[in-house]
Amino acid sequence: MKQDRLTLTAGFFPAVLMGLLLLLEGVQTRVELTPWALLAAAAGAYVLPTLILRLIPGSDGERCRLRFRPFKRQAVPFVLWISLAGALLAALANSGLSLLLGQSYYAESAGWQPGSIWQGIALAVLLPAVMEELFFRGAVFSALERGGTWPALLLSSAAFAMIHGDLSNLAGPLLAGMLYAYLTYTLDSVWPAIFAHLVNNSLYLFLSYAAKTYAALGVWPYMLLIALFLFCLFLALAMRSLEKLIEKGRIRRFQYRGLRQGLINGFISPGMWLLLILFLVRVLYQ
């Protein structure tokens, strides 16, 4: 089965993004960048490959859709509840993986500085939510989708997780990426994914601050128990909202066409292997 030109090309773009981000990290070690200069450089690293991928036509002349269209207002409760549940699941998954690796994920990554609150929000919350979703769900997922919906979801989510380049922060982005791709496809809009990503990053920033402030008091395990309870609550509310949307036919169903062949094409893609190599190099270097 011949692979679509756009799908094959899109497989290289996460590796291109990883290369740009590694280059930016290298520049940071040699040149002191202000937070706003870093913000602009990081935004450029995402915008450039997104625009290029958007302009590349497929074998049939069609281009990938960034899905800027608004989603149905009836889906707002579902988006809200599943975003909260997804953020908590990602936090719990990262915490569990960190325990297995003998690390304390949020305590080590807590870099909250009250004097730079707006810079922290821009760099840790707004920029990743908007730029990463436009690239991974708007461009990459849409391009890979031509080879099958499920392969596109799995491959774009795996690439999304590897871009974060940290074993302790791998499980959360993988699960979150699958949720964001699901929202993008079923609601045919990138905005629910951006909102869910904003919620996730906001929770990450809060937990980083809480870990740094209260970890010495020994309350972190109790916070995880509270997070687990809230996850179950929000998930139940989300599933109830989703059930109503399905009953009224207001949500798209996933297509299983070409699942096996799409996965084979994706996992033997040279672009995905290049990304995996860059990810392993970054992990070993760290």
Regions found by a protein language model. Give the residues of each.
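Transmembrane alpha-helical insertion/packing segments
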Residues: 1-38, 126-127, 132-135, 208-209, ...
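Interfacial transmembrane-helix boundary/kink motif in multi-pass membrane proteins
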Residues: 2-16, 60-91, 250-275
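Residue-level signature of transmembrane alpha-helical entry/exit and packing/kink sites
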Residues: 5-14, 34-42, 71-79, 116-121, ...
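Alpha-helical transmembrane segments in multi-pass membrane proteins
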Residues: 16-57, 221-229
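Alpha-helical membrane-inserting segments
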Residues: 20-28, 48-56, 85, 89-97, ...
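Juxtamembrane helix-loop-helix connectors linking adjacent transmembrane helices
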Residues: 27-36, 62-134, 142, 281-286
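Membrane-water interface of transmembrane alpha-helices
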Residues: 47-60, 95, 232-249
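Transmembrane helix-loop-helix hairpins at the membrane interface
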Residues: 118-285
